[in-house]
């Protein structure tokens, strides 16, 4: 797998997202702008300027009409994908660490930081998909995280629940209409934060990554842990591959803890695990520093990773990836 190296950011990557068609990649970094790229050749489609601080998060609606971003300047911004125009800015008391559209992009959730006496919150905003129409200032729902702040969050199937990962390693399930807390489960080791939460294609289950060096596959309905992937390094990101039963994990020693310059020493590789058998099946090297974010093409043709080194690496899966099977899987096919 020869990667395409995308060099559009001057500082560490924070998040990568593919659009639903898998042909455009959006990336954010700590350098105040969002980049859009063509996935097949790495050509830059454009940049979105306006934020006044590190951008932590981005998401794109299913029709690739609008994108939303959250940043350290305490704002959520809505952008027109085609023109790069900022359609709306919502102000908050603290930094916004995660944004995600629901399945039909009529609502957007935003996770805010706990800081300066303000508690961490999950806020839901109503979205108008017409780029020429007005956007509402009102918050449709505010969930306050009094126990432990939320670090990541997302919408389950049919936008039924809001699932949040917390700083204390727990995962919560909220009713998306009322904001009522339905479940809270200690999925990861106490006080080691959940660093990422990404969905299966049908949003009935999700994968979490954590500083406790594990990733977990969790059922969205009852927060039951179905699979555990054990690694030897703190994880920053985890993603589920469609088509094949794999998960991709990314992490590495924290940048400030790195004392050696060898990429091998810091464990800066994307790791592939078998989703069902929980075994590591391969690694992809390349980043010079921890992997901060991994994202998989929704069509299952490839994946992208973003690192502390400021690069996005886009990989197209080759034939060997699609042909790979466990002996058990081969036996089942032959029957």
Curated annotation (Swiss-Prot):
Question: Mind telling me which Pfam families this protein's record contains?
Answer: EIF3I
> Where does each WD repeat begin and end?
8-47, 50-91, 145-184, 189-228, 286-325
Q: The organism sits in which domain of life? A: Eukaryota
One GO BP annotation is: formation of cytoplasmic translation initiation complex
Asked whether the UniProt record includes ATP-binding among its keywords, one would answer no
Q: Which GO terms describe its molecular function?
A: RNA binding; translation initiation factor activity
**Where is it localised?**
Cytoplasm
UniProt keywords, alphabetically: Cytoplasm, Initiation factor, Protein biosynthesis, Repeat, WD repeat
Its family?
A: Belongs to the eIF-3 subunit I family.
Functional description taken from the UniProt entry = Component of the eukaryotic translation initiation factor 3 (eIF-3) complex, which is involved in protein synthesis of a specialized repertoire of mRNAs and, together with other initiation factors, stimulates binding of mRNA and methionyl-tRNAi to the 40S ribosome. The eIF-3 complex specifically targets and initiates translation of a subset of mRNAs involved in cell proliferation.
Q: How does it assemble?
A: Component of the eukaryotic translation initiation factor 3 (eIF-3) complex.
What is this protein called in UniProt?
Eukaryotic translation initiation factor 3 subunit I
Record organism: Sclerotinia sclerotiorum (strain ATCC 18683 / 1980 / Ss-1)
